[in-house]
């Protein structure tokens, strides 16, 4: 007789009792341990993790280089606050990121804690540099859950419900979406119209864009669109901010998504996979722009914590030593081909898209009108979990299934995930 009692139901009741409903947990699981691209819950069941803590674990769970770096740093300095005293991991990380992003140009970096905090500080820096106040963001974009981050985010539900009034002088314009009929030319014309009718270019401090929209549905901005945006911002003295919080650190096959377009942003926001699971974010940008705020204008008690900076340095080392950029690109192609095979058999998969190892399926109710099917998406997510695969949804209509597996995922795990997804599709469609 098996006397083992599952812990999960009790722990989920504890979660419901003591954690507010506004903090959604996508899967009714309680995790005990993790390694690489795998998780085990408190009852011992194994799952393939194709969420990666929502894109935080490009390096995988508990990478040995990251674990060793954090353990070593913990023996020296765990926290000191950079506004009080400097410490070497912060300085070394700032130099490496500036060299990675800026090349031979003079760049500087400031570190914070969360992605939303990096976005807010990027806007502050842009406003200080230009002495302008307006900001343009994109429909479907996601830039965090703080009040300014929510204002910049181009989706209403659930992020903006009952949280207003929002920050002033933030404007939204269409993002290219070939599947929904929005070309680069159409998006650029809409931006021109915005500048002609709602806010003059000489009042715009910054334009902020994700090179691949994350929560908005894994839409990749075409190269020509990013290049045109760079030309427009240079013409009008507008700071171009690339939000690389989800796309950075190998997710698209390059260090950063903007590198596919061959452009040089003014400011870049980084977070998520930067520190391999530890809380760390940053703004990296041209030195003249980064130095615009007065002394004391930037900061944060935990920003650039010594443990997180040590972890980030280990992440960069691991990427270079293990050729993870090339690996991610190869894994992305393997996953893409598998998803295309599924699409060929199921018309409900309207689109397979993304960049590198940042891929998604868009699910629809009918092939002609392409009506979003959020219900099918949720049922597929639930069925995949039962089969041992964790994935989550995104998209303005929540009908997009996204994949954010670690770059250390094996080919066998990719194939296993595709097999689980295939079976889950068959069950929910029948």
Question: Where in this protein do the model-derived segments appear?
Answer:
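Conserved N-terminal phosphate-binding loop of PLP-dependent enzymes in the Aspartate aminotransferase
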Residues: 2-430
